[in-house]
Amino acid sequence: GKWMIAAGMAIFGDNNPFGWRFSAALIGTLSVALVAYAAWLLFRSMTVATIAAILASVDGLMFVESRLALLDIFQMFWILATFVCLLLDRQQSRRVLARKVVALAQQNGGTLPQLVFGPGSGWHLWRLAAGVCAGAAVGVKWNSLFFIAAFGLLTVFWDVNARRILGLKNWAVVGALREGLPAFVQMIGVGLIVYLSTWAGWFKSSNAFYRHWAQDNPGQGVQWLPTD
């Protein structure tokens, strides 16, 4: 979030009010588009998407946050982006899984064979993108973790439910194992890497805020444990 604010200041000057407001205004505008796109992916209705965009654009809190150099609008943007990526992943993975099930049925004379595990849903590239956005959201504010945890459970539920709809055997247990572990790596693993990368400037700097706090406040007994 602070990097995004700094980008506007770098372009228009750090003493220019427009510079430190620019990124928030841009991200707030893009957030309206994400709300509309999420509504369209959920309901496949341009009317619903338009109503969602209008409601988002006239929301008082969202309007105010888009005018200020605060972190909330950037957190909302990355959380929305995570959700949209997961919606796209649901769409793509279900399409891939359905194609594989149809192919198996055709090979078996039109009847789906009773496989123990069933086919996988392929590479979840959109879920990887969701992991990137999730890491960025946590990099803005730690309380984004609550949203990410809910999204992680939601994406696994979608995958498991897709297997149930297609009539695959042992859809609950197999789906949770086959989709849950990759989802954890893609959401949490990738997100953790992205989150740590947001601290790159702090690690590279020698005079960053609290950069040498651990050295100046060594622990007692267990040396890595601070005194207070």
Feature-to-residue mapping (PLM):
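Transmembrane-helix motifs of polytopic, lipid-linked glycan transferases
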Residues: F22-F43, A81
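Short acidic/glycine- and proline-prone juxtamembrane loop motifs at membrane-interface regions
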Residues: W20, A24, R67-F74, V140-N143
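Short helix- or helix-capping micro-motifs
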Residues: A52-S57, V64, V84, A134, ...
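Aromatic-rich transmembrane-lumenal/periplasmic boundary elements in polytopic membrane proteins
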Residues: A172, I193-D228
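Alpha-helical transmembrane segments of multi-pass integral membrane proteins
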Residues: W20-I27, A52, L71, P182-Q186
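Short hydrophobic/aromatic helix or loop-helix immediately within or flanking a transmembrane segment
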Residues: G1-F18, S23-L26
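Membrane-interfacial entry segments at the cytosolic side of transmembrane helices
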Residues: L166-G189
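Membrane-interface transmembrane helices that cradle and orient dolichyl/undecaprenyl
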Residues: F43, T82-R127, T155-L166
